[in-house]
UniProtKB/Swiss-Prot annotation:
Pfam families (UniProt xref): fn3 (PF00041), I-set (PF07679), LRR_8 (PF13855)
Signal peptide: 1-22
Protein name as annotated: Leucine-rich repeat neuronal protein 3
Subcellular location per the Swiss-Prot or TrEMBL entry: Membrane
LRRNT domain sequence ranges: 23-69
PROSITE patterns for this protein: FN3, IG_LIKE, LRR
Length: 708
């Protein structure tokens, strides 16, 4: 009991002390600002309870004259502060300073000599134009510096001297036109560098070599068209890199090979037109690959993504022209679990693509124009345990009988095992105007079972097979046509043809050079009859014009007195020899070659030719066949006569009906077999090259109408 007064005095003293401190704190807090304890994460992501002074959005013109002594975080965002004067009253424990969205125009107006403990400084959305030498050298403990969205056009080589503890540097959205590797000599511990959305003209070799501890590099939105092979040399600890929203037209494969520990790669929103063989290969630590939102991406070629033993996820979505993925595009990816391919222009995905991914757990191919035929039938064959994401958005676009149906609801037996090739409409444009001397590529890809072969036909009718190399043309094995140094002579119609055992598909592009076609010289067309037989005629032709369409028409009119048969054929323009077969002996024909040009004019020429007559042996053979045929016909008529006689003797049958049937049968008009069965049309195989007809059309005109 004697100790009670003492305890009361102690508690009273503590209460008075706390009250005095609270009053002092309240007095020190700047007017209109909020002073309180708030959660805060350090640059190294350590959580702490920090004494925070919040003076955001108050229209302040000057830095607060007095702050609580224990202030750790000072927020001055969205004011009109243009200068920070020297003061002896700066809190010595200040670790975070946010001066974003103010009116600062020079770093020299920011006096930070009394802020040695600062860890984070935010200077975003001010009017800073340059960083002079040693401008922040007193901040030896600084770990984060944000200078995004300023007007920086100049950074002195020694601007960051003294910031040897800096971990994060953000320079996005300024006016920098170059990157100087000397900037980084003073930043050996930098882990994150963001320098996107600057008008940087190009990146040079060894630009980032001093950043030996860099882990994340973001070079987004700076209109880069290429990355030098040695640009990333020295970044041995780099784990993540983003080239988002640049103008790269191909994967910077050689540069990426120098980053041996890369785990995350972002190439989203670049106009890369194809992922080529080996573009992503032997990157032993890569875990995630992003190739989304690429407006020009058409195909992912064979072995494009190869030997990435740690890759877990591929995202290739929202690519409006991505219409082809080679069956062997993804190879040696033992840990790949997630394959995102939704919202592209894919008509199919080969089963072989999926079979090559042993650990695949989920796939997304919805929102694609799926053609429900042989290539995609594996989906419904219950041969996979892979989870399809958003299956309710997976619909058939073709063929018409399945249009609008959910792919998973079409039975695999309703889809053929083999099917025609299909060249995606998005592969290349139908018309293109190019400048003289330029280089152009057309990427032709087709899906089918069996897999199709692809070749090209030039305006002159020249056939270009895969791996063909000339002075002007090169056809890649995948089907890409390169035209080098375009001149007016290269103008005209180029046709890609995809063919397999089932049939063929074609797609053409009309090229103008400097807005016009080559001059039309009213080129000649010559026809030559190379061989005449009793049942066939071999015809060839030559056109001086080099601007033919990809189809040639052939027609033949039989000029015998009673014949009305005519046939026609459309064939590729690279075929200039044609064999007309199954013709009638000793018969005069009119053969016409009709060649349309890109000027909507036609080169047409006709010749008359008479087939040979049959030799004596053939005549004797045909006579024997005719005798045999007549004997069989006589026997057949005899049997019919007996049947009719028996029918007449029967009281239940009408004899007149039988006589009427025989009479009608015998009165059938006669006609040549060639008129009823048009001659088969075969392409002439010249040498070892095999050409496939795109469309063969045979018609018979004016046959007798009362054949029954």
């Amino acid at each position: 009991m004697k100790d009670m007064p003492l305890q009361i005095h102690v508690l009273l003293g503590l209460a008075i002390t706390t009250l005095v401190q609270a009053v002092d704190k309240k007095v020190d807090c700047p007017q209109l600002c909020t002073c309180e304890i708030r959660p805060w994460f350090t640059p190294t992501s350590i959580y702490m309870e920090a004494s925070t002074v919040d003076c955001n959005d108050l229209g302040l013109l000057t830095f607060p004259a007095r702050l609580p002594a224990n202030t750790q975080i000072l927020l001055l965002q969205t004011n009109d502060i243009a200068k920070i004067e020297y003061s002896t009253d700066f809190p010595v424990n200040l670790t975070g300073l946010d001066l974003s969205q103010n009116n600062l125009s020079s770093v020299t107006n920011i006096n930070v000599k009394k802020m040695p403990q600062l860890l984070s400084v935010y200077l975003e959305e001010n009017k800073l134009t340059e960083l002079p030498e040693k401008c922040l050298s007193e901040l030896s403990n600084l770990q984060e510096l944000y200078i995004n969205h300023n007007l920086l056009s100049t950074i002195s080589p020694g601007a960051f001297i003294g910031l040897h503890n800096l971990l994060r540097l953000h320079l996005n959205s300024n006016r920098l036109q170059m990157i100087n590797s000397k900037w980084f000599d003073a930043l050996p511990n930098l882990e994150i560098l963001m320098i996107g959305e600057n008008p940087i003209i190009r990146i040079k070799d060894m630009n980032f070599k001093p950043l030996i501890n860099l882990r994340s590099l973001v070079i987004a939105g700076i209109n880069l068209t290429e990355i030098p092979d040695n640009a990333l040399v020295g970044l041995e600890n780099l784990e993540s890199i983003s080239f988002y929203d640049n103008r790269l037209i191909k994967v910077p494969h050689a540069a990426l090979q120098k980053v041996v520990n890369l785990k995350f790669l972002d190439l989203n929103k670049n106009p890369i037109n194809r992922i080529r063989r080996g573009d992503f290969s032997n990157m032993l630590h890569l875990k995630e690959l992003g190739i989304n939102n690429m407006p020009e991406l058409i195909s992912i070629d064979s072995l494009a993504v190869d030997n990435l033993p740690d890759l877990r996820k591929i995202e290739a979505t929202n690519n409006p022209r991505l219409s082809y993925i080679h069956p062997n595009a993804f190879f040696r990816l033992p840990k790949l679990e997630s394959l995102m391919l939704n919202s592209n222009a894919l008509s199919a995905l080969y089963h072989g693509t999926i079979e090559s991914l042993p650990n695949l757990k989920e796939i997304s191919i919805h929102s694609n124009p799926i053609r429900c035929d042989c290539v995609i039938r594996w989906i419904n064959m219950n041969k996979t345990n892979i989870r399809f994401m958003e299956p309710d958005s997976l619909f058939c676009v073709d063929p018409p009988e399945f249009q609008g149906q959910n792919v998973r609801q079409v039975h695999f037996r309703d889809m053929m095992e083999i099917c025609l090739p299909l060249i995606a409409p998005e592969s290349f444009p139908s018309n293109l105007n190019v400048e003289a001397g330029s280089y152009v590529s057309f990427h032709c890809r087709a899906t089918a079972e069996p897999q199709p072969e692809i070749y090209w036909i030039t305006p002159s009718g020249q056939k270009l097979l895969p791996n063909t190399l000339t002075d002007k043309f090169y056809v890649h094995s995948e089907g890409t046509l390169d035209i080098n140094g375009v001149t007016p002579k290269e103008g005209g119609l180029y046709t890609c043809i995809a063919t397999n055992l089932v049939g063929a598909d074609l797609k053409s592009v009309m090229i103008k050079v400097d807005g016009s076609f080559p001059q039309d010289n009213n080129g000649s067309l010559n026809i030559k009859i190379r061989d005449i037989q009793a049942n066939s005629v071999l015809v060839s032709w030559k056109a001086s014009s080099k601007i033919l369409k990809s189809s040639v028409k052939w027609t033949a009119f039989v000029k015998t007195e009673n014949s009305h048969a005519a046939q026609s054929a459309r064939i590729p323009s690279d075929i200039k020899v044609y064999n007309l077969t199954h013709l009638n002996p000793s018969t005069e024909y009119k053969i016409c070659i009709d060649i349309p040009t890109i000027y909507q004019k036609n080169r047409k020429k006709c010749v008359n030719v008479t087939t040979k007559g049959l030799d004596p042996d053939q005549k004797e053979y045909e006579k024997s066949n005719t005798t045999t045929l007549m004997a069989c016909l006589g026997g057949l008529l005899g049997i019919i006569g007996v049947i009719c006689l028996i029918s007449c003797l029967s009281p239940e049958m009408n004899c007149d009906g039988g006589h009427s049937y025989v009479r009608n049968y015998l009165q059938k008009p006669t006609f040549a077999l060639g008129e009823l069965y048009p001659p088969l049309i075969n392409l002439w195989e010249a040498g070892k090259e095999k050409s496939t007809s795109l469309k063969v059309k045979a018609t018979v005109i004016g046959l007798p109408t009362n054949m029954s």
